[in-house]
Amino acid sequence: MTTNDIRSIIEQEADAVRHIPISDRYAEAVDLIVKHVHEQGGTLITGGMGKAGQIAMNMATTFSSTGTPAFFLHPGEAQHGDLGIIRPSDLLLLVSNSGKTLELLELVQLARGLVGQIPIILITSDPQSELAREATVCLPTGAPREVCTLGLTPTTSTTVMTVIGDVLVVGTMERIGFTTADYAKRHHGGYLGSKSR
């Protein structure tokens, strides 16, 4: 691998981030999060499978550490009892590159069967997909080509998903007036904990 190879990979990923579609849907997503979590006392529940699931898990921990209670619900485990954690005041933040992930489609139906019409924020490459049709707010990734030499391994897609999640986190922090003191209460240990105090 040469420095040109490395530069090319980085540039392709950076270009994908620059081409994430920007719309008022982001503000709508933040409004939903603030309404259901900070005004109605609900929880932001994230979900995804495979690499997208890892991104969803990271989103949950980042939201939680910045003042928005959240947790990751594994779609498979949801079918074996974990679904019971969902309450009527909660909302779902789902991550699926294809927008067709069977386990997430099933999770949506199961959640609705339990608590009714639960709001759904979806991050996907396909705004016309089955999951997108079920979503309250759909945030498209721009469907970037994977930088992987096979064009298959989730690489560029997970990068843009992460960035979209960061936009939602920061937007929510701004809306709720999250401060350094608030951060310190939730992040006592490590370098960031000491830096925030």
Regions found by a protein language model. Give the residues of each.
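Internal, active-site/partner-interface "lid" segment
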Residues: 133, 147, 174-197
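Residue-level signal for alpha-helical context at structural boundaries
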Residues: 31, 81, 186-187
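An N-terminal, well-structured beta->alpha segment
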Residues: 1-39
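Glycine-rich phosphate/diphosphate-binding loops and the adjacent beta-loop-alpha structural elements
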Residues: 38-45, 49, 189-197
